[in-house]
C-alpha cells in the first residue's frame, strides 16, 4: 500500500513539474549532460525528456519492488532500484522548485 501511495505521489509531482514547464513557457537553454537532447532543444523539451526519464525509473522501481515481494528479485536490486528512483524524483522536485522560484523572482522585477 505504501508503494501505491508513493507511486501516486511521484506521478503527481511529475505531472506538476510538467504543468509548470508548460505554463511558464520557459525559454531555450543548452541541455545538461545527463539528459541527451538534440542540439538547440528548448529548455521545455529538455525538462520533458527529464520527466519521462524519471517516470521510467519510477515504473522500473515499482516493477522491481513487485518482483521482490514475489521473491523473484534480490533485496539488493530492489533497494538499489528504489533508491535510484527516489534520487531522480528528488532531483526533479528540486528543479521544479528552482524554476518556480526563478519565475516568481522575475515576475517581481519592475518593468
From Swiss-Prot:
Q: Where is the signal peptide?
A: none
Q: Name one GO cellular component term.
A: bacterial-type flagellum basal body
Cytoplasm listed as a keyword: no
Q: Which Pfam families match?
A: FliE (PF02049)
Alphabetically sorted, this entry's keywords are: Bacterial flagellum
Q: Name one GO biological process term.
A: bacterial-type flagellum-dependent cell motility
Task: Please state where this protein is localized.
Answer: Bacterial flagellum basal body
| Protein origin, superkingdom | Bacteria
Q: What is its main location?
A: other
GO MF annotations for this entry?
cytoskeletal motor activity; structural molecule activity
- The reply on keyword Manganese is no
Q: Which InterPro entries match?
A: FliE
Family membership noted in the UniProt record = Belongs to the FliE family.
HAMAP family hit by this protein: FliE
Matching PANTHER family: FLAGELLAR HOOK-BASAL BODY COMPLEX PROTEIN FLIE, PTHR34653
**What is the name attached to this protein's record?**
Flagellar hook-basal body complex protein FliE
Organism expressing this protein natively? Brucella melitensis biotype 1 (strain ATCC 23456 / CCUG 17765 / NCTC 10094 / 16M)
Amino acid at each position: 500500500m505504501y508503494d501505491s501511495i508513493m507511486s501516486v505521489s511521484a506521478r503527481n509531482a511529475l505531472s506538476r513539474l510538467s504543468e509548470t514547464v508548460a505554463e511558464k513557457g520557459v525559454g531555450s537553454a543548452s541541455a545538461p549532460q545527463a539528459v541527451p537532447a538534440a542540439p538547440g532543444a528548448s529548455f521545455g523539451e529538455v525538462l520533458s525528456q527529464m520527466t519521462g526519464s524519471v517516470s521510467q525509473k519510477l515504473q522500473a522501481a515499482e516493477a522491481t519492488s513487485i518482483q521482490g515481494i514475489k521473491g523473484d528479485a534480490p533485496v539488493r536490486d530492489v533497494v538499489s532500484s528504489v533508491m535510484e528512483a527516489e534520487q531522480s524524483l528528488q532531483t526533479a522536485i528540486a528543479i521544479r522548485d528552482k524554476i518556480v522560484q526563478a519565475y516568481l523572482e522575475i515576475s517581481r522585477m519592475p518593468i
